[in-house]
From Swiss-Prot:
Organism annotation: Xenopus tropicalis (Western clawed frog)
Lineage of the organism: Eukaryota, Metazoa, Chordata, Craniata, Vertebrata
Site-annotated residues for Interaction with the K-D-E-L motif on target proteins: R5, S54, E117
Location of region: Important for recycling of cargo proteins with the sequence motif K-D-E-L from the Golgi to the endoplasmic reticulum: 204-207
Intracellular or extracellular location(s): Endoplasmic reticulum membrane; Golgi apparatus membrane; Cytoplasmic vesicle, COPI-coated vesicle membrane
Gene that encodes it: kdelr2
Transmembrane segments: 5-24, 33-52, 59-79, 93-110, 117-135, 150-168, 179-199
Protein name, entry field: ER lumen protein-retaining receptor 2
Pfam families noted in UniProt: ER_lumen_recept (PF00810)
Length: 212
């Protein structure tokens, strides 16, 4: 494992922990897109079905279990425990416009036409756009809480670091996964505007708000 993958995994884990702590400590999921969290839960479920068929390492298995567990814990907090605080009026992105095309693309473009491989490919494509409901929600409300922006920053950082991981693996291992790289580039691009606002506003102590 190289430093970029490890840093990416830690950034991803930090994002998940920040979100869970934000919801639990505030006893509220206001400003959080439940639809994005449902998509992430679907991403991890379809990606890590290999937990049932293979073992790579204790680290690999542990991280997969943590991601799946935290994803469903987040969904539970939003839709069950703190349902009264969920802002469904602003969380209105039509997720079928993501899931259906991604499902079709994963059947057409994959590494191997087998159930597990198609589901893995589906998860890669879906993860690249799963944050869109959250970004759409922020665009509708016009602002985001600081802690929510920290969550989004670490989530975007995780994906950016994974791009460097792919570059490192190609340079030193000769490994090249076009599907993962293209999806990662798309996902990173979606965060570009947010990164700019995060650096120019949030890191200077200002609240992230979008221009009217």
């Amino acid at each position: 494992m190289n430093v970029f993958r490890l840093s990416g995994d830690l950034s991803h884990l930090a994002a998940i922990i920040i979100l869970l702590l934000k919801i639990w400590k505030s006893r509220s999921c206001a400003g959080i897109s439940g639809k994005s969290q449902l998509l992430f839960a679907l991403v991890f479920t379809t990606r890590y079905l290999d937990l049932l068929t293979s073992f790579i390492s204790l680290y690999n298995t542990s991280m997969k279990v943590i991601y799946i567990g935290c994803a469903y814990a987040t969904v539970y907090l939003i839709y069950m425990k703190f349902k009264a605080t969920y802002d469904g009026n602003h969380d209105t992105f039509r997720v079928e416009f993501l899931v259906v095309p991604v499902g079709g693309l994963s059947v057409l473009v994959n590494h191997d036409f087998s159930p597990l491989e198609i589901l893995w490919t589906f998860s890669i494509y879906l993860e690249s756009v799963a944050i869109l409901p959250q970004l759409f929600m922020i665009s509708k409300t016009g602002e985001a809480e600081t802690i929510t922006t920290h969550y989004l920053f670490f989530l975007g950082l995780y994906r950016a670091l994974y791009l460097f991981n792919w570059i490192w693996r190609y340079s030193f291992e000769g490994f090249f996964d076009l599907i993962a790289i293209v999806a990662g580039v798309v996902q990173t691009i979606l965060y570009c505007d947010f990164f700019y606002l995060y650096v120019t506003k949030v890191l200077k102590g200002k609240k992230l708000s979008l221009p009217a």
